[in-house]
């Protein structure tokens, strides 16, 4: 079990470190050493507690209620994106439906891509879709940051994803 002051904060710290462009390879020389710090198993605990440890946005959140405006909302992202990782938070590492708490997954995966593949952090877009959650405990938690509605239907989700893919391709065609 991680403690609040150490492991659970690592995804947030990782993002801050990547923004500062610190050189981690002097201390961590292999992906095997780095992965447990910024992804599995640390990211699972961070996702479970995301609504408790949240300090600032680490990516973009798009709500089901944003339908029809996704392309305009993407204009708010200040960087030229080369790679996006997205989640709807419904199936997080065997932990179940965590809704928008799943943001740790795209953040963590993109941290690995940055650390192991040399992708510039500013060229990444962690993206979480708030399409509701079937996790009643989360919907009732006063700290939960997502929509307090059940997950949308598969058909509605597909239509949302179609609009999103068109918007992403239009905004960043490369």
Which residues does each predicted region cover?
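Metallocofactor- and cofactor-centric catalytic cores in central/energy metabolism, strongly enriched
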Residues: 1-174
């Amino acid at each position: 079990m991680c403690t609040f002051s150490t492991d659970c904060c690592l995804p947030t710290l990782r993002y801050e470190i990547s923004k500062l462009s610190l050189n981690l390879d002097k201390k961590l020389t292999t992906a095997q050493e780095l992965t447990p710090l910024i992804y599995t198993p640390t990211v699972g605990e961070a996702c479970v507690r995301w609504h408790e440890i949240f300090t600032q946005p680490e990516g973009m959140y798009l709500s089901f209620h944003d339908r029809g405006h996704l392309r305009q909302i993407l204009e708010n992202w200040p960087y030229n994106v080369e790679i996006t990782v997205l989640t709807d938070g419904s199936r997080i590492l065997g932990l179940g439906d965590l809704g928008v708490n799943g943001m740790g997954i795209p953040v963590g995966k993109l941290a690995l891509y940055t650390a192991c593949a040399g992708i510039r952090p500013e060229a990444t877009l962690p993206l979480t879709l708030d399409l509701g959650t079937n996790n009643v405990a989360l919907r009732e938690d006063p700290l939960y940051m997502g929509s307090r509605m059940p997950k949308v239907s598969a058909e509605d989700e597909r239509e949302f994803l179609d609009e999103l893919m068109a918007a992403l391709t239009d905004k960043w065609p490369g």
